[in-house]
Amino acid sequence: MKKVLSFIIALAMAVLICAPSFAADTVTEKLYNVYGDGMLFQQNEEAVFAGTGKQGRRVEAILIDSTGRVAARGASVVGADGVFKTSFKAPAGGYEEYTVELRSNGYLFEKLENVVFGELWLSGGQSNMQIELRHSVTGRQMLADGTRGSKNVRYFYSAPNPVYKGSADNLPFEPQTEIEGCCWFDGTDDRIFNISGVGYFFAEKLQKELDMPVGLLSGSLGGSCIAAWIPRETVESDKNVKKAIGSAYISEKNWKEDGSLSVLSDCTGLYNKKIAPLTNFRPAGMVWYQGESDTGRDYGRYTTLFNALQDSYTRLFNHKNGDLPVVISALCDFSFGGLDGMKKMTAEFAEMQQLRPDSRAVVSVSDIPLTYYVETQTCHPAEKQPVGERMAYAAQGLVYGADNCVSAPSMKSSEIKDGSVYITFNYVGDTLKVKGDRICGFTICGKDGVYVPAEAEIVSKDTVRVYSDNVKKPKAAMYASGLITQRCNLFAYKNGEFVWPVLPTVTDWEYIDNIVTDFGWTDCDTSEIWRQESLTLAGYYDVWESDGAQVQVSPEAAYKGAGGLAVKGAADSFSVSPVTTYFDEENNKNIFQEFKQDWQNYKKMSVMVRNNGSEAVTLSNIKIYKENGKWVSPVLDGKLKTSAVIPADGEWHKLTFNLNTLMFSGKTTPAAASRTYLDNVADVEFCFEGANADLSMDEISFETTGIASPVIKLLGFDPVSLLFNLVTTIIGLIKMA
């Protein structure tokens, strides 16, 4: 009997001892994989834990501080759908590291170590956000010298290029709950070199400025359109959004499994895969660098879609204090969407920001060097640190109340008065200020809608006057509209420092068809300028070249501005030309440097010339080349000849040529109404004759037709110029006879 009793007692004790492990073996609850050791939750918000389990089980989340004390807890029950979601109120942010235990019916099934609370942000966009830290200038230096980031910055990494293959299995129709291959780590981990360079510098800078742990959720993919990041229910509930998305919308019926889906552009695909799984986080805001893939579309389309994206993310992340704040990066210089596509998009960003100034900021990037690495192509500038740090600067003003410029300067209002366009800007800091001798980057147009380079002056701390002698009755002005805008030099200025450049600006979107890009050579202020139209080749190139002469940019040769062109003839006949092409060896072809311009809408071309020598010099002609090598020369205004004598008087002379009356390849008979021969200008050559010539050239400018552009477009020519040139030609031929 004693033996039996002893056996029963021993068996009971064994059962009691082993019961937890037996029970634990039957626990099926698990967290979604977006949670992990070393993670960060937004302070003072609900810290939500979600996953799957058996219906009816009680799931508890317990927060344990560094002393072992329970700091917070919350519980819920697994629902009929097999999903649980439990939460507790997150404590104030700080550097204390916590443990979170997840228990099912009292049994531990998950433990998260080294959890902190602070400021959590989401990063999103396409390739310029995705480009990894290791492909940035600073990142490469960090790799070389062993530098790492802060342990107080926590990164949620998700592989930017998972294997989608365009199938419904890999690009699901429904929002997902997990992200393949995701993980959390801090800034001291070697894996930081795989995260977004812009995101890294944003988070590191924000952490230092706030003196608070910062977390960053990653969500970007190169080449992606904005439509891919918007949830389906948002699209289907708003006909304007659905119309703006157009063919990128795909219904469930047509969500094919044959590999034809586009990861980059089809509506909701990337949202389902990379954003929806983050729904239980509570980010304080988002940094966004996207838009290149959406250039070349109608004005206003992107605004419609971005409004939808911001509204849907505000709901998704349960942001309670107005809209989810978003800091947007302007687009870098490149020819996506045409020569002016990127600048039109950034100009729309600027106007979009003013629709919701309390929740949006735009940072400008036009002054940041366009250094690049061949393996990441020229459209991905490698200087990511200034971009990320400017986003952190904007976030401090937008979200955290710092006395910063909240956004880069953008147009507040404009007024046409006394032959000038007056533009008033927001967010100028203490004042607008120019870097250099004069403001570069403004253009102006009349009723013909054709823009020409303009003069500009700051008339008050936030207002600029824009004008041109060649446009007497302006209709609109633009700023930083060209392909390469690094010469644009108007800045917000605060506390004795240049903060960032003014954003691309359009005063009237009705006048947007004939934008002139910054040729770089017309003001003769600089000897080198950055050029890029190739994905693999870009850099600083000479602005001018010569044949039979020495040429250099010199302040002593300036008529206006920082410099002019000093020309020393080495032969009796010589020429100077702007450099318009460079050779792309990889593709074995010439690349035109933001050139190949349509000059049909220009009526006159002028150049300032000074003869510093002792003998007269003749500008024999200006040769304007087409790509096929054929050339024409404009006649001197009011004359039937292409040449002009420059007297040796040491004075500046303005030589004006009529672009509507041209001599063909040296012939002496002019042709009337020949504007169509200027539809694709590939090169320009200024040809001179004179021994021991010593010239200064500066300020090459253009005058437009002045005829409303719809008339010219309809007829294909300028009727006023046609009549004038016919009369001039007849009179000239009579005199020649």
Give the ranges of each region predicted by the language model.
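Short, flexible helical or helix-coil boundary motifs
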Residues: 12, 252, 704, 734-737
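Cell-envelope and extracellular/periplasmic
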Residues: 24-518
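Beta-rich carbohydrate-recognition modules and glycan-binding surfaces
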Residues: 512-729, 733-734
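Bacterial N-terminal signal peptides
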Residues: 8-16
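Positively charged n-region of N-terminal signal peptides that target proteins for export
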Residues: 1-4
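General helical structural elements
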Residues: 7, 144, 158, 607-608, ...
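Generic N-terminal simple sequence motifs
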Residues: 16, 497-500, 551
